[in-house]
Structures are given as structure tokens and as C-alpha cells.
């Protein structure tokens, strides 16, 4: 992750599930779920190379936010039409669509450069539609990614990991409370 240029930006990324019967297409609320399905990757980290900038379409006068980022190698292949949701800095959640995806090397695990834009903030209708069309939810774990492990965790695994983290903190606190000697400022061997 440290070898890929850009600033870290945590997003909830909706990657299109493409098969022989469905092609790459932008998200449309009017399309049924069987014709457009997604895999949600929560807490995914994009490496921003061009920060979000306000731009205006001269013909329509409509404002849009545009930017560019890198997708780290070994994660997934981004497609034009993928969408993601993330904070845009003013407390609002932006609804972004990938407008360009380019593989940057011939290697199997390559960095992908993406460009994205938005013309609106997320809305309850968009969230509801994306939720209906989501067939798989994964969590991105940057620690697993850094150590070359499978970077995705399923929802049930994430719940177990959260419980283990909480249990570890409770155990650590109890251990120090029971075996720490205040007088000598050290741990006493049990």
C-alpha cells in the first residue's frame, strides 16, 4: 500500500458482477437487480492521485465533482460504471461513478488508475437501490493486505474479528489490573 502513490481515501465500493449475460453499465435505479448486481467492499482504500475538483459542464451548466485514484494490486479489477460512496468533506456523502479504468502494467497483479465523477450526493433512493442489488458484502482489511493475505473479510468473519478485538482489550486491562505492582511499577509473575 505504501508503494502505490496517492493519499488514502476510505470508500464503500460497489463493484459490478459481470457475467456472459450482463455487460458493463452505469448504475441505473430503473434497472432490475437481476440485470445489475454488485459486490459491496466496505472500508476499501483508494489512493487518490487527483483530489476532487468542482467542474462545470459548459453545455448543461451542471456542476460535477471529478477526481482520480489508484486501485491497489491484488484487490479487484475496477470497471467503468462501478460506483462508490464516501464523505466529500462537508459532512455529505458523495455518490461517485468510475468513468475510466486503466491497467498500468502488464503484470497480473497490477495497479489500476481510475477516474471518477459525480453530479449528486447520495440519497435514500440510491442507497436503497444499491442495497437491493448487492449480492455479496465484504470488508477490506488493510492489515491482511499489507501481509500478503486475502484482503477481504466476510460479514460474519468481521463480527468475530470485532468481538476478538474487544475481548483482547478487556483481557489486557484485567491482566494489568491483577498483576501490575504499583509499588515497583512492574508486572508480577503470576
List where the protein language model places each region.
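Interface-prone segments of viral and bacterial extracellular assemblies
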Residues: 1-190
Amino acid at each position: 500500500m505504501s508503494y502505490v502513490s496517492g493519499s488514502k481515501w476510505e470508500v464503500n465500493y460497489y463493484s459490478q458482477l459481470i457475467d456472459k449475460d450482463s455487460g458493463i453499465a452505469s448504475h441505473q435505479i430503473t434497472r432490475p437487480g437481476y440485470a445489475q448486481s454488485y459486490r459491496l467492499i466496505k472500508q476499501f482504500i483508494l489512493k487518490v492521485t487527483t483530489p476532487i475538483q468542482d467542474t462545470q459542464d459548459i453545455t448543461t451548466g451542471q456542476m460535477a465533482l471529478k477526481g482520480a485514484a489508484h486501485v491497489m494490486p491484488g484487490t479487484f479489477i475496477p470497471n467503468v460504471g462501478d460506483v462508490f460512496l464516501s464523505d466529500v468533506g462537508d459532512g455529505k456523502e458523495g455518490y461517485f461513478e468510475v468513468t475510466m479504468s486503466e491497467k498500468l502494467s502488464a503484470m497480473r497483479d497490477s495497479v489500476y488508475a481510475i477516474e471518477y465523477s459525480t453530479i449528486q450526493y447520495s440519497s435514500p433512493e440510491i442507497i436503497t437501490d444499491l442495497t437491493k442489488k448487492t449480492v455479496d458484502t465484504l470488508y477490506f482489511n488493510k492489515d491482511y493486505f499489507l501481509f500478503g493475505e486475502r484482503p477481504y473479510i466476510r460479514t460474519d468473519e468481521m463480527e468475530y474479528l470485532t468481538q476478538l478485538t474487544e475481548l483482547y482489550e478487556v483481557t489486557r486491562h484485567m491482566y494489568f489490573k491483577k498483576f501490575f505492582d504499583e509499588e515497583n511499577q512492574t508486572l508480577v509473575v503470576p
